[in-house]
């Protein structure tokens, strides 16, 4: 459908718009009520899933194109389904009409990390794969904030009652924190990105610290990507601040023994969550909100780019 027009479309590309698809840069920020020595985080969409429907004609066209295209590896091929990886395994594609009809859902899915695609690869994917789909939309968006700071020194909590899981590193400090469960509409991960890169890819990060706050949004929550973590707090509470020794002791216990929260009644949980917020001079989520606000238009352009009606060359 679009594969012969790739070069022509590329010539019309407004490079400054696509360049703005890159992650946001670092800068120092000061917010009212919070004195930040932490640099502004680098912000990006780190994962996307787009689903849509292939009609019979487009399914045949796409299958024919994919079977001869050298940048695509196909398997599990039948008349009503196929699986594929494209662009050096950076994109996963799945089509299954029978399963979609029986489960009453859309029949094609495309998964990728836009940070790993070049501008040319983005155009190729949109024009040769995604534009074949009808009734397409996002079912997953991952919003990633990368901090050049040691977030193990911070205390993370949510106002909502969600499951919290913590994994500790060899030094005894928190290395990964999960809020929620993986199959929920929102799943928050806070982890040591520098250590993760070293462990998984043996890649050495030059920064002294690199931590990521990643918010995985699915299904209906993708529509709220620009307002999805109001209940999250990443704090540096000073447990010695409360005047009452009993409150000091309780706050210290809650900060250092996560299991203690489960022993509190509902009103006590609310009281101490409020107190912990009050005794923290810093809440990094305020920095995250300001970063998101500053970059909201460019992030929206990324979303618009993948939608059928959007064209850079207009």
Curated annotation (Swiss-Prot):
GO biological process: DNA replication
Record's keyword terms, sorted: DNA replication, Plasmid
Keyword Transmembrane: no
Domain of life: Bacteria
Function: This protein is probably a specific topoisomerase involved in initiating replication. This protein is specifically required and may be rate-limiting for replication of the plasmid in vivo.
Family stated for the protein in its record: Belongs to the plasmid replication initiation factor family.
Note from the entry: The nicking site of REP proteins is sequence, but not plasmid, specific.
Name of this protein: Replication initiation protein
Organism lineage string: Bacteria, Bacillati, Bacillota, Bacilli, Bacillales
Gene (UniProt): rep
């Amino acid at each position: 459908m679009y594969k012969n027009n790739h070069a022509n479309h590329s010539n019309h590309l407004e490079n400054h718009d696509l360049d703005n698809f890159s992650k946001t840069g670092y800068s120092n920020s000061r917010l009212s009520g919070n004195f930040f020595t932490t640099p502004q985080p680098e912000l990006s969409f780190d994962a996307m899933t787009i689903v849509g429907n292939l009609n019979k004609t487009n399914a045949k066209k796409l299958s024919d194109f994919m079977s001869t295209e050298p940048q695509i590896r196909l398997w599990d091929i039948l008349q009503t389904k196929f699986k594929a990886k494209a662009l050096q395994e950076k994109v996963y594609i799945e089509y299954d009409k029978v399963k979609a009809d029986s489960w009453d859902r859309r029949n094609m899915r495309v998964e990728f990390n836009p940070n790993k695609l070049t501008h040319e690869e983005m155009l190729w994917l949109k024009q040769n794969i995604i534009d074949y789909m009808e009734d397409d939309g996002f079912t997953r968006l991952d919003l990633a904030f990368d901090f050049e700071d040691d977030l193990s020194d911070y205390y993370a909590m949510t106002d909502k009652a969600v499951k919290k899981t913590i994994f500790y590193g060899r030094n005894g400090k928190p290395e990964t924190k999960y809020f929620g469960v993986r199959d929920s509409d929102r799943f928050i991960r806070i982890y040591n990105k520098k250590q993760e890169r070293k462990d998984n890819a043996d890649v050495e990060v030059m920064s002294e610290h690199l931590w990521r706050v990643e918010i995985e949004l699915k299904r209906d929550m993708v529509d709220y990507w620009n307002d999805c973590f109001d209940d999250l707090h990443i704090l540096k509470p000073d447990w010695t601040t409360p005047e009452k020794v009993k409150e000091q002791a309780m706050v210290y216990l809650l900060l250092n023994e996560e299991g203690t929260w489960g022993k509190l009644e509902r009103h006590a949980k609310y009281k101490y969550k409020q107190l912990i917020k009050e005794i923290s001079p810093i809440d990094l989520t305020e920095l995250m909100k300001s970063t998101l606000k500053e970059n909201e238009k460019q992030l929206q352009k990324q979303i618009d780019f993948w939608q059928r009606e959007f064209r850079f060359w207009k």
